[in-house]
């Protein structure tokens, strides 16, 4: 009787060990897959961030960032300056500024502030389209697609931060847009920690996007 009990215990223990081995194997596979995915994603984001694809197109689109009581933040300022430079180089005859404002704001919008800045820097009023309703990157792309369809724009140069452009391009492609990415110049030295945060934000945001998980706080506009 004792021998039978001992044999049963060994069989149960063997099944338990086998189950634990399977779980460890599955965990290893998931970990390796995640490392491979995020490694590929880092490479792709970095490749887009370091390449300026600006070329003749139908329009230039400036993705929104924070504005402070009617004044563009340093990040938005740099994006708009880059758009002005592209316009002066005759890359495109039209500049689209994207971005709305929070309910608690002064009533100003990123798109409206961008339009005013472009006007002050020599871009004619009739050459500017200000989009003022979107509240995040996804909505900016959706509104850009509507503008492109309405105005029959076949190609657009999109301007934003380098690390932001990979996700923008993928969203634009999903919306049926032909876009060329053009990163705005860096603002001074970016610390390793800040840069790592930017990459982490974009990698996680894009992953959630592809998993069809909607966490607005993860894929909003830049605040700087």
Briefly describe each language-model feature range.
Residues 192-222:
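A transmembrane-helix-recognition feature enriched in membrane-embedded lipid enzymes
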Residues 3, 40-199:
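A structural signal for short, hydrophobic/glycine-enriched beta-strand patches
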Residues 1-11:
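Short, intrinsically disordered terminal tails adjacent to the first/last structured region
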Residues 14-17, 21, 188-191, 198, ...:
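Coil-to-alpha-helix initiation sites in intrinsically disordered, low-complexity, charged segments
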Residues 25-32, 130-136, 161-170, 215-224:
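Electropositive, surface-exposed helix/loop patches at the edges of structured domains
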Residues 10-52:
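N-terminal type II signal-anchor transmembrane helix
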């Amino acid at each position: 009787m004792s021998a039978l009990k001992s044999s049963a215990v060994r069989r149960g223990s063997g099944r338990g060990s086998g189950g634990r081995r399977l779980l460890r194997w599955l965990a290893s596979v998931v970990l390796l897959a995640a490392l491979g995915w995020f490694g590929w994603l880092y490479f792709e984001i970095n490749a887009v961030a370091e390449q300026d694809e600006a070329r003749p197109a139908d329009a230039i689109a400036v993705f929104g960032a924070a504005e402070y009581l009617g004044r563009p933040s340093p990040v938005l300022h740099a994006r708009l300056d880059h758009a002005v430079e592209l316009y002066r180089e005759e890359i495109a005859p039209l500049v689209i500024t994207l971005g709305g404002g929070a309910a608690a704001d002064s009533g100003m919008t990123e798109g409206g502030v961008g339009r005013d800045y472009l006007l002050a820097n020599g871009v004619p009023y009739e050459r500017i389209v200000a989009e003022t309703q979107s509240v995040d990157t996804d909505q900016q792309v959706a509104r850009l697609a509507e503008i492109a369809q309405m105005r029959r724009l076949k190609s657009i140069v999109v301007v934003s931060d380098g690390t932001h452009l990979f996700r923008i391009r993928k969203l634009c492609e999903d919306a049926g847009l032909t876009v060329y990415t053009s990163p705005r110049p860096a603002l001074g030295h970016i610390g390793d920690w800040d840069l790592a945060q930017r990459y982490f934000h974009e990698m996680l945001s894009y992953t959630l996007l592809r998993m069809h998980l909607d966490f607005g706080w993860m894929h909003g506009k830049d605040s700087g």
